[in-house]
Amino acid sequence: MDVNVGLSRLQSQAGAPVGTKGSNTRLAAKQRETLQAYDYLCRVDEAKKWIEECLGTDLGPTSTFEQSLRNGVVLALLVQKFQPDKLIKIFYSNELQFRHSDNINKFLDFIHGIGLPEIFHFELTDIYEGKNLPKVIYCIHALSYFLSMQDLAPPLIKSDENLSFTDEDVSIIVRRLRQSNVILPNFKALSADFMLRASPVSSRTPSPTRFPKHARFQTLNSSDSASIYSSPYTSPTLEFSKKDASARSDILKMHRRTKSATPSLEQFNEPYKQTLPSHSIEFEDSFFQPPSQKGHMQRSFLTTFSAPTRRREALFSTTSGLSQRSPVDEKIVNAIQACGRGVLVRLRLVDMLQSLVEQSSSVVLLQAVIRGYISRNTYRIRKKAYDELVNWVTSIQSISRAYLIRAQYRKVVLQEEATKSIQTLQSIIRGGFYRRKYHSLIERLDLFTPSFVLIQSSALGFLTRHAIVNMLDNLYNYIPLFNRMQSILRANMFRNEWSNFLDSVQSFPVSFHSICKGRLIRDSINRLNGSLLGELDNFIKLQNLSRGFMIRRAFKEKLEKLKASTSSFIALQAIVRAFLLRKNLESIYDSFQKSHLSVIKAQSLYRGFITRTKIDYCNDYLLKRLPDIVFMQSAVRAILLRDDVNYTEVQLDSFIPEIVLLQSLIRGYLSRNKFSRKLQNFHKNMENPIVAKSIFRGRQEGLAYRELATAKNPPVMTVKNFVHLLDDTNFDFEEEVLLEKMRKEIVQQVRDNEEIEVHINELDVKIALLVKNKISLDDVLKHHNKYKFGKQSTEYLKINTLSMKSLNNSSRKFLELYQCFFYVLQTNEMYLANYFQALKTEGTSSVKIRHAVYLVLQIFGHGSNRREEVLLLRFISQVIKLEAALVNSSQDLLSDDCVWKLLFTGYRGDVREVKLWKTILGRIHKVLVADNHLDFEINPLTLFKSFNPEVASQTDSPKLTLSLAMQHPPTRNLYVSRLRELRKLCQSFLVALSKNIENIPYALCYTAAQLKNSLQRYFPAAHKEEIFGVIGKFVYWAYVAPVLVSPDNFKLVDGSITALQRKNLYTLSSILSEIFSIESCDSKQLGFFRPLSEFIEVSKQDTMLMLERLVDVVDPEVYFEFDAFEDLVNTKRPVIYMKRDDILGIYSSIAYVIDSIAPPDVNDPLRAVVNSLGPVSEQDNDFVQDETDVKLELNPKFCTIENPVAQERTLIVQTKRYILFIIRIQNGLNLLEILVKPVTDSDEAAWQNLLAEESEKNARNYDLFDDSIFSMSFAELKYTALSNIVEMEKLGFANRRNNYQDMVNSIALDIRNKSRRRMQRQRELDAGHQSLLNLREKRAFLDSQLKSYNEYIEQAMETLQSKKGKKKLIPFSKQYFHMRDLRKSGRVPRFGSFKYPALKLYDRGVLVSISHMPQKEKLYITISADEVGKFILEATSPTVKVSSPRCELHLDDLLSAQYNKVLTLDVLDGRLKLNTNMFLHLIFSKFYS
């Protein structure tokens, strides 16, 4: 029965009378442990309530709170509460897993980051494994004080000491503390410790606000007050006697010096209560003042120096019979305190000076290095700025000088022109005309003045706004540079000012304040002048606008006044105008009379000016019509030239014989001169005829090869001269061998990585079971040792290259059939495509389909060479066609369960074109990744909250809307600027991608082209945008997005990227994904990218044009220059490497659905192979039992015999080989002549010599496909070749009319493509090296992950070994006698042995039934273990001998049976039936407890 336990009850129990001395000691220790446990539960309750107050959630009862902290979820939530700006991923799980350590590490990083002293930190094992949970509670207490002192968190409230806990809770805590052997921290000294850290030493007067008086502070009379000088890990119970003795000795020593007895506390207090005021009894120094005594004024000076522990209070609170003495003077107390503080300050000062002296050399060196770096950096910045400023100032000066010179020149010209009288006359004449025009214009303007004013204001406003927008755009681009330059200049100015300040302080300490004030005032004036100068242009513009507005307003007022008085001034104006006109005419007439000659001269000048103007106009008109004039002139010249040519031809026609004779004489002369030069050169170089011959032969061979390469129908003899080019050199052979080894290594690396991943997953499961204490460490070590880090078995690394010579007849037969089987699957893509359709039709799970995709990629060698890449692309194309015919919409082709996407991802899942993507994404990554603080957050609500953080914290404020956020000018400006930057980045990416579209991998282009063809075929109603939208999504998400969003995975950037940088990349990716979707959409669907809708639509059109270029590719056979007959022409067979289980799995799957994937024709190649192989159980045992990799040299045997198309190809290739041998023996003008030419003995001898050379060459390199040619005579060879050509002529592949020139052209094409094959092989080698590099990097990552798991296992092993103990046997029990018998026989198992009666196991439910064995009463079952995870079950009977009484059981088999819900297990040949769950329970309880 649970009984509530309170502090009063515990204290009453502690004070109860007890019996003997020994029992008193034990009881006191037990009560002390109970009090400690109760006090610790109170501290746990305080920590729980503080966390609940911070998080606002209920954390359950106090008794389970300590264990609930082990997964770190509560601590991680606490971190998220105090750091809301950081995204923290918290791992939740009901079961404790190793990944919970991430939550704990986040909390440890948090307390380290905020500066919590390391003395309060705990280790990961303290909380995860529960080794020291009190230290975790102590850390939470310290964190609460640390944050509450900074007003970042609520204070921790002391729990009421009348809390009630059950006896069971207290006993659990006592038992746990006793087992862990952990010393409880001193929670009571924690608050004072933080007060000590926060208080300055030199404080003389107590401040009522320095230490807030919360509920956690108690008075001096409280029984649990602790010393501020005690260690955090000092237990009050352990240092009880030490404090008592030290306090007592200190008091006695102090009073022994005064030769008086020790007074009591009351005797000291009484005089001071009467004589001293209340405020004089307060503590003199808040540094020594306990926080619990701030509010108590009636304390004596002796209380200040007494240690605030229970024993010391008890010491001074008891009255004694000692004699009274006079009170101590207050000055003495102050002096003692001052001396104490002085000693402490001097000690600290000495320590500080000593540390500074010890580190002075390092500090001086560091300061010198820093000053040097700052000086060099400042010099570089100033020099760069000075160079830029010099260039700028030079250009400004040159512009200014030019402007001044032009102004002076214009001024001089105007002055010279003003002196001329002609200008005066012209001005007078023009003045009259202008005044007339002015009056008429004024009258018209009066009608349209309001409209003009409105138009002008609108235009000025538009121009002003446009100029401001342009100016802001330019400023936004230079804001980061301005900020950086300003920060550098401010820092430099600040350092200069600070150095000057220090110098001035050291030199002139008296004028320090005046210098500072003067400096500050000058700085403020300079800053004000600088800001005003920076806005000078704006002020000038504002003044101009103001003056213009005032002038227009004054002009408008004058016009209104004039309009009001128009009627009264009309008559007066007419009279005045008439008078002025008459007077003006008279003056003009007089001036004309005086300047008659000048007028005539002016008129002549005016006529000259008019004439020159007309001429200029005419010239301008002619220049505009210049192309027409040139065209007309050229036509006229052509007519004239043709007339001259016709006349010349007529003249030459009459002299043709003479011209021909002259030309022949000239040619003869030139030829004779050329021949004579060659003859002289030959005679001159007669001494070195070998060089001449080699030059001549080289020229002849060059001409012959040019003829072979360019001629449409090259001669047979030309082809014969270059037949040797078809032979492979030693270098070619070495490259082929290297390429094969590389392919083999790639396949092996892929499998190794998969093996490690599977092993890591198994270890993860085993570790989880180990943590839950379900299995022992030894079972985990079984997997650990099976694939230990850095040690792999030689059998796993050794590749079993099974050859045809090392197998027996049966195995050789099956291996050859499997080689034919996989060749058929490779070369005919319809079989595998139909196989996947059959799987999807049967509703196969996605896991099995992915496994089938993995196996199929192994058949094609993951496209590691040219041949397999062509075949794989053809297979993917066929799968796309079949799936496009079955889907309902075009978008369904992009679903994740489409087989063609799985195939392409497995084939091109890794990006190999790193250099290409560095070119395309270089600028984007430089902008987004280089700056760690760049943020492209475009949500206006978030931006508004960043400018107004108080809005987010106010709960009673109205709901924030998007329109309200956009009305905020800073938010709107930042939103627009970030959209503008994103638009620039998108434009740069699209331009770079368009420029490098030719470098995109061919596999991606071909797959996109096949996708386009399939969509156009099966969705004829789909418009162009829809089709290219599907292609764009595929290209973007399959190839572009992974590189753009995760550049660190592809080594495009150095190191890793932060969460903010990845968020910026995702923002840019959102815009690009919308652009690549091609199809138009409503602008409302763009969300916050709505202002970019016009840009996105335009970019979609450009992207569609780019995708059209991307899908414009040739067939794989043309691109890779792959011949359909290449497998039969090459002397080396294609090779793939597969495991025995994969071979049998693929074969069994294909054989199961053979009726669905192959036509019903019996002669079908696939059916023929499957029928020959038969079921898997009937195959050769040696081949089936082999678990290593098998080398399959693919054999086209069935294709050449059964398949008509393959038979035709084989016929063509064999005939070409026969012709190659024939033309090397005999010569002729054409192929038909050589074939019908009779065979002589010399031809037979030459044929035998050729066979001997070929045999030696092939024996050194590799085997040929067909060895029958070496058994033929030359006559038989010619007869076979002629028969094949006749057969090909019947099939339409050869024609006798052109002497079988088609065969010669085909051989010439093979010769020309030989060098291209070498280049292609080199490209394959480069691609293989890159693939191996990527696979090795992945292997390194997997190895590091495996190493971490292994280290955890080693740590767990050490933990369990330290706790492992040997159970004691009960004397004279059945187990005791059983173990004694085993020791006598020397057969004691390593891990134990247990013997049970069968009846007992039957009663427990372990044994279900017994058959063909003795009865349960007479049968005994023995279970023993001598190896890890391996148990021996033995049945014995004392009366009857049991046949075959032993069997072995493996723990993996038992766990698998339990996992597969197998209820019973049959052992001993079915004679015993065991309950699976109960038997496993028995095993775990006996061998793994």
From Swiss-Prot:
Gene3D superfamilies: 1.20.5.190, Calponin-like domain, GTPase Activation - p120gap, domain 1. Its main location: cytoplasm. One of its GO terms (cellular component) is cell cortex. Keywords: Actin-binding, Calmodulin-binding, Cell cycle, Cell division, Coiled coil, Cytoplasm, Cytoskeleton, Nucleus, Repeat. It is found in: Cytoplasm, Cytoskeleton; Nucleus envelope; Cytoplasm, Cytoskeleton, Microtubule organizing center, Spindle pole body. It comes from the Eukaryota. One of its GO terms (biological process) is mitotic actomyosin contractile ring assembly. One of its GO terms (molecular function) is GTPase activator activity. Residues 359-388, 389-418, 418-449, 535-564, 565-594, 655-684 form the IQ domain. PROSITE patterns: CH (PS50021), IQ (PS50096), RAS_GTPASE_ACTIV_2 (PS50018). Residues 870-1110 form the Ras-GAP domain. Residues 734-770, 1330-1364 form a coiled coil. Residues 41-147 form the Calponin-homology (CH) domain. InterPro entries: CH_dom, CH_dom_sf, IQ_motif_EF-hand-BS, RasGAP_C, RasGAP_dom, Rho_GTPase_activation_prot. Component of the contractile F-actin ring; required for its construction following assembly of F-actin at the division site. The IQ domains provide the interaction surface for the myosin light chain MLC1. Interacts with calmodulin cam1. This is Ras GTPase-activating-like protein rng2. It comes from Schizosaccharomyces pombe (strain 972 / ATCC 24843).
